[in-house]
């Protein structure tokens, strides 16, 4: 019998067998329908990876999907050192930016609830912030999104115009929230059509895309909630050293202004309707 044209080396066969045996011995099993999936957008922030993994692991045995968007600082290699569980995944892309790569990751997830985390976030070392969010989703089938960074009691996406809710307090319904963390019910996301890809070209910032989905949710029978989680630091604090600020500050500002106009054009004539929906939802809270 002829030798195969592309033989697998014997040492590779042994290493594969050893790896399979180690996985079986670990006791970890693949979850077909995990309760929650964390999705991390990663872009050249290798120094924060260990801390993110430690914090997310402390939150429970959940799915972890990392979207490394073309980092050049060794981030993919560092992620691979950590992603060793059956429900861990690493998606590689080439600077598509958050809208497109997280959209693909949400469709990849097998949990009903996903939680979007950014690569500059500092994850709490106790899990109550995750459990609380999951309880809110269980209590309200119409709840599509929960944000933990800033919430807004106006449809205006600009914090300079609509003063944000930014700090501790009980859960409440709000007009819109932004990422970090950003919990979303996957079926609601899909029924709403997902992120609006017109909010950025591939590789460009997509400022306000997270807020727009919230406003779209309210006008389609869903609800949006806010409960502060200090992933960006203490209430009222944000270092403003995220990727778009560091790498493309001018494009970021142009994008913010353009997308703010988009939101006004779409929702200005429905502002009173959204106001009433938010107010009514809050009166129904236990």
Region roles according to the model:
Residues 3-19, 31, 201, 205-286:
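C-terminal catalytic/acceptor-binding lobe
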Residues 122-160:
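Conserved donor NDP-sugar-binding/catalytic core segment of glycosyltransferases
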Residues 51-63:
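Short, acidic, metal-binding catalytic loop of nucleotide-sugar glycosyltransferases
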Residues 99, 152, 166-187, 206:
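A recurrent flexible, glycine/aromatic-enriched loop bordering the glycosyltransferase active site
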Residues 112-122:
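Short beta-strand-to-loop acidic/aromatic patch adjacent to the donor-nucleotide binding site
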Residues 68-77, 122:
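A conserved acidic beta->alpha catalytic loop
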Residues 1-54:
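N-proximal low-complexity "stem/linker" segments adjacent to membrane-targeting elements
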Residues 92-109:
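Glycine-rich, basic loop-to-helix element that forms the pyrophosphate-binding segment
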């Amino acid at each position: 019998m002829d030798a195969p044209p592309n033989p697998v080396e014997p040492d590779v066969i042994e290493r594969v067998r050893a790896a399979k045996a180690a996985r079986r011995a670990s006791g970890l099993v693949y979850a077909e329908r995990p309760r929650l999936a964390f999705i991390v957008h990663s872009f050249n922030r290798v120094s924060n990876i260990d801390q993110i993994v430690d914090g997310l692991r402390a939150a429970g045995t959940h799915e972890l999907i990392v979207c490394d968007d073309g980092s050049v600082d060794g981030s993919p290699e560092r992620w691979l050192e950590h992603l060793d569980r059956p429900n861990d995944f690493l998606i590689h892309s080439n600077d598509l930016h958050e809208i497109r790569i997280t959209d693909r990751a949400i469709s990849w997830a097998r949990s009903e609830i996903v939680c979007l985390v950014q690569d500059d976030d500092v994850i709490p070392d106790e899990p109550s912030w995750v459990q609380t969010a999951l309880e809110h989703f269980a209590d309200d089938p119409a709840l599509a999104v929960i944000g933990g960074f800033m919430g807004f009691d106006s449809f205006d996406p600009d914090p300079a115009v609509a003063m944000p809710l930014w700090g501790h307090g009980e859960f409440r319904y709000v007009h819109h929230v932004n990422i970090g963390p950003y919990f979303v019910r996957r079926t609601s996301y899909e029924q709403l059509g997902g992120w609006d890809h017109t909010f950025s070209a591939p590789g460009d910032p997509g400022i306000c895309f997270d807020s727009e989905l919230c406003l779209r949710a309210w006008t389609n029978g869903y609800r949006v909630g806010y409960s502060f989680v200090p992933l960006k630091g203490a209430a009222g604090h944000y270092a403003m050293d995220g990727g778009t600020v560091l790498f493309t500050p001018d494009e970021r500002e142009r994008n913010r202004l353009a997308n703010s106009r988009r939101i006004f054009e779409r929702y200005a004539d429905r502002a009173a309707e959204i106001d009433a929906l938010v107010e009514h939802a809050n009166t129904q809270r236990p």
